[in-house]
């Protein structure tokens, strides 16, 4: 996180992503003076729970590292070096008017109206040249703001640095654990919760695993500055039919044309 300003982490369930982020936030506050750190989660209670974890860490670090605290409550911690950590739910007004040095967005794929929130928050982020952003989440459908940022980071079209934590990266998880987990749930649930796989939000006639197995043929050329891909040239005097599946406009899925 130190080497990159914008960071996004796709991690499987129960991989320690939140607690690891809490440790980094505490370190950042202790060793950087006059910084404002904001923890925003899909629910205010979740953000406050993360702040309580930071408080517990603070109580258990070596005494010579423990800073003085000017204020400590359920919603914020203010240190003697004038750095502070705030916790709140993700809303358009969460950090409006604040000069934020480090913004942490937890389980961002589960935030309702995430695109609207991100649009209103980005000016606060971009106003500071050194403002850091850390976004973490498990996969939760296709087309939401987290999915868009992640895909952009992987493809190298935005400023985010992508990090991925898979189930086999977690100590104690092996093939036997995988088989037992699938037996207790399902392959689809395992892929979503532990496989870092993005599935559509609704049930489909053909299951998502089969659809994801298909691969498009290579396109032959691009038009419209690369936004339009051409796979085959139209054949003269042939009739063509287009089927359209429109999205509901909730930022959860794409409109598709076949």
Whereabouts are the PLM-identified features?
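Catalytic acidic motif of RecA-like/P-loop NTPases
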Residues: 14, 109-112, 248
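ATPase catalytic-site recognition across NTP-hydrolyzing enzymes
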Residues: 167-244
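Inter-Walker segment of RecA-like/P-loop motor cores
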Residues: 49-101
């Amino acid at each position: 996180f130190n080497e990159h300003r914008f960071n996004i982490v796709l991690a499987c369930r129960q991989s320690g992503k939140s607690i690891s982020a809490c440790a980094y936030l505490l370190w950042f506050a202790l060793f950087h003076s006059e910084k404002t750190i904001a923890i925003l989660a899909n629910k205010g209670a979740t953000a406050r729970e993360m702040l309580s974890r930071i408080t517990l860490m603070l109580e258990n670090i070596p005494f010579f590292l423990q800073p003085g605290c000017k204020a400590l409550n359920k919603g914020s911690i203010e240190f003697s070096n004038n750095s502070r950590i705030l916790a709140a739910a993700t809303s358009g007004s969460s950090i409006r008017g604040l000069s934020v040095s480090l913004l942490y967005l937890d389980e961002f794929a589960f935030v309702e109206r995430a695109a609207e929130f991100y649009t209103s928050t980005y000016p606060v982020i971009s106003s500071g040249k050194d403002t850091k952003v850390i976004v973490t989440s498990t996969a939760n459908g296709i087309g939401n703001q987290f999915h868009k940022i992640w895909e952009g980071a992987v493809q190298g079209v935005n400023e985010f640095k992508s990090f991925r934590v898979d189930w086999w990266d977690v100590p104690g998880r092996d093939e036997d654990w995988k088989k037992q987990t699938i037996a207790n749930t399902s392959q689809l649930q395992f892929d979503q919760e532990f496989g870092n796989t993005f599935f559509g939000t609704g049930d489909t006639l053909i299951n998502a695993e089969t659809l994801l197995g298909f691969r498009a043929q290579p396109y032959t050329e691009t038009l419209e500055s690369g936004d339009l891909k051409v796979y085959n040239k139209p054949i003269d005097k042939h009739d063509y039919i287009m089927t359209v599946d429109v999205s509901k406009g909730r930022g959860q899925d794409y409109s598709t044309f076949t």
